[in-house]
Amino acid sequence: LDEKSAKLVRRHLEHHGLRFHLGQTVTRAKCSGKTVQRVVLQNGKELPCDLLVVAVGVRPATALAEAAGLTVERGIITDPATMQTSDPDIYAAGDCAVSVDMLDGSKKILALWPNAVAQGRAAGSQMAGGDLTVGGTYAVNAIDFYGLRICTCGLINAKGDGYTDRVAAADDSYKRLVFRDGKLVGYVLINASENAGIYTSLISGGVPLEGLQGDLMDSPNLFWFPKETRITKLRGGVQL
């Protein structure tokens, strides 16, 4: 999320009884036998608890890949199109593999189901002698918190020259579209997900927006896509 949308989500969660302790980490837990009763924060404050969930991000388990002599950074380095590793006979896909974000070229772990599926299909095809490749990977997420629908995609915190955005905000909704070089490269949608599919397709397809008829914020439509793309989407992705 960006800063404004994060504040909206936080306010909504606090309304439902959640409390935030920002900028703090848990330094230790106080237990009675095997039961956690309290945790101590970095600032010395103690919080009672019935259940302690530890969640500080994910890191791929790469010990096997390293033992096999594969090139590993934060994850296993692969060809982003074929998923071939530094060993030509070994392929990697999914959360263990470093992805290349198609929108800015950065290398990162994109531990998301759609990316894992695309990479797995490409790796399987390549190992079987086929030529299927990964079309491109990027971040996309959708979640619901107590009825607050949140969708994000692409470069939502991009900064620097060449990036612009459009924002529409209300008390319980938020829409932000991020642009670069005349194309949509990211969005944040909160209680405004009606056109999420079209926005995602505009991003993944790299569709130029110049000269398009209609308001992108309120009324994007399939006629903005090339004819062959429109036909495929209307047929549910099946080529007839």
What are these language model-derived features?
Residues 209-240:
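Cysteine/selenocysteine-centered motifs that mediate thiol-based redox chemistry or coordinate metal-sulfur cofactors
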Residues 14, 18-19, 31, 70, ...:
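Generic secondary-structure signature for well-ordered alpha-helical cores
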Residues 96-197:
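Mid-to-C-terminal Rossmann-like scaffold of FAD/NAD(P)H-dependent oxidoreductases
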Residues 29-33, 178:
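Aromatic-rich beta-strand edge motifs centered on tyrosine
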Residues 32-40, 45-125, 211, 217:
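FAD-site-proximal beta/loop scaffold in flavoenzymes
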Residues 1-28, 112-116, 134-142, 147:
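Rossmann-like dinucleotide-binding cores of NAD(P)H-dependent redox enzymes
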Residues 21, 40-41, 77, 144, ...:
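A general beta-strand register signal
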Residues 193-210:
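A short, polar/charged loop-to-alpha-helix boundary motif
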